[in-house]
Amino acid sequence: MSTISVLITALALSMDAMSLSIYQGIASTESQKKQNFLKIVLTFGIFQFAMALVGSLSGILFIHYISLYSKYVSFAIFLFLGLMMLKEALKKEEMEYDEKYLDFKTLIIMGIATSLDALLVGLTFSILPFYQTFLYTVEIGVITAIIAGLGFILGDKFGNILGQKSHFLGAALLIFISINILL
């Protein structure tokens, strides 16, 4: 696999993380932006790297089981997050960002939900020498972190421009992605 192929793969893998990052950029208050930006970038970058590496190390032993359920788990999580965001957007009063929303448990769930596909991609690396696998998985993690950061910034800008309507946009985006996962 060439470096260009890994770059394109990493960009494709990072789209789920970008979607959630956009939402976090929209939802975060001014006082939470820097902290949430770091949480998002690190969580998505580390999880994409780690899951791709775990996938490559586990080889073909578990590919059947992982491939059976990964899209359904991702669908359920994205749909749940989208519906939760839609429910909040439908409230009449101005929404307040819940600082507990990005607690450790939530970050873990989001990290897993966005990196199940990286686990499967990692399985394709299992035939490569370890040093090459490691470099490719690091590349995937770094690119995902960058894309997640850009998504957060984009969400922040949209949130400032659109106000509360941006929550409808974020909800629609998450629900669309959940449906797209099943197709």
Swiss-Prot record:
GO terms for biological process: intracellular manganese ion homeostasis; manganese ion export across plasma membrane. The gene is mntP. Signal peptide: none annotated. One of its GO terms (molecular function) is manganese ion transmembrane transporter activity. The keyword DNA damage does not apply. InterPro entries: Mntp/YtaF, Put_MntP. Its main location: membrane. It comes from Fusobacterium nucleatum subsp. nucleatum (strain ATCC 25586 / DSM 15643 / BCRC 10681 / CIP 101130 / JCM 8532 / KCTC 2640 / LMG 13131 / VPI 4355). Pfam families: Mntp (PF02659). It is a multi-pass membrane protein. Belongs to the MntP (TC 9.B.29) family. The keyword ATP-binding does not apply. It is found in: Cell inner membrane. It comes from the Bacteria. Keywords: Cell inner membrane, Cell membrane, Ion transport, Manganese, Membrane, Transmembrane, Transmembrane helix, Transport. The chain crosses the membrane at residues 3-23, 43-63, 66-86, 107-127, 134-154, 161-181. This is Putative manganese efflux pump MntP. GO terms for cellular component: plasma membrane. Probably functions as a manganese efflux pump.
